[in-house]
């Protein structure tokens, strides 16, 4: 069981000279479990700062590497998605470096989890068998070869929206594969939500935000609250 904390300290750090990140540390005495957070497609914006704050308040030291550090979203977005599709590349190297820095801190325990949103949720699934104790994917893209990608994975929690386009079948596919692979899991589909339903505010800025809203990708506070309750319970069980 993790220790509930309030008002975590958020600090922008340099993980390496080329890689920045956002670190959240709870107030009070540690040590705390560690969690690597992988941001959504729009980078470390106001929504992602709210998500890292929320998780750290539950008693976790959380580090979110900025996968767009080497030139911003315009330059890095394509390369990051190529890495996600291939399951290898600079983005995975950056996440691994962030994990190493995080787990070497004296104020963390020997437990480490990974959580991702949107694009980051896809990374979280692919990282589930890479030395983590628990993984949470929030509306993350599914790997092409689920059996290969999730073999030997740690326990996985998933939160998906029933109105989320190509991810409508995510629960069915993940449940079937993870059950076959005997991986502990808890996947939930929220029938009244679309993509990015856990964001506190509409993402994408004035232009993309309006387009996303039309597609059903918009906040759903009630479902988001339930998803966070599930996340805190899940990490509380597996990262204690």
Language-model regions: role of each:
Residues 4-107, 200-217:
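Serine-hydrolase catalytic machinery in alpha/beta-hydrolase-like enzymes
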Residues 51, 168-178:
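Short alpha-helix in the alpha/beta-hydrolase fold that links the catalytic acid
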Residues 96-153:
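Primarily recognizes the serine-hydrolase "nucleophile elbow" in alpha/beta-hydrolase
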Residues 143-153, 164, 220, 229, ...:
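Conserved serine/cysteine hydrolase catalytic core
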């Amino acid at each position: 069981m993790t220790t509930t904390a309030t008002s975590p300290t958020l600090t922008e750090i340099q993980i390496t000279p080329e890689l920045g990140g956002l670190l959240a540390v709870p107030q009070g005495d540690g040590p705390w479990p560690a969690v690597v957070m992988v941001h959504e497609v729009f980078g470390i914006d106001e929504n992602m700062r709210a998500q890292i704050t929320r998780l750290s308040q539950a008693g976790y030291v959380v580090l979110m590497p900025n996968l767009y550090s080497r030139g911003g979203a315009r330059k890095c977005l394509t390369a990051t998605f190529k890495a996600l599709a291939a399951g290898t590349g600079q983005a995975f190297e950056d996440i691994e470096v962030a994990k190493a820095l995080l787990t070497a801190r004296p104020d963390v325990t020997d437990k480490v989890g990974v959580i991702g949103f949107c694009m980051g949720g896809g990374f979280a699934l692919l990282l589930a068998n890479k030395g983590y104790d628990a993984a949470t994917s929030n509306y993350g893209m599914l790997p092409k070869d689920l059996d290969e990608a999730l073999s030997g994975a740690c326990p996985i929690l998933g939160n998906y929206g029933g109105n989320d386009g190509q991810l409508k079948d995510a629960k069915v596919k993940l449940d079937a594969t993870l059950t076959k692979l005997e991986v502990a899991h808890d996947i939930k589909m929220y029938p009244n939500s679309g993509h990015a339903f856990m964001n506190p505010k509409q993402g994408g800025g004035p232009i993309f935000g309006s387009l996303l809203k039309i597609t059903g990708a918009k906040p759903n506070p009630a479902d988001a609250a339930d998803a966070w309750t599930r996340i805190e319970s899940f990490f509380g069980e597996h990262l204690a």
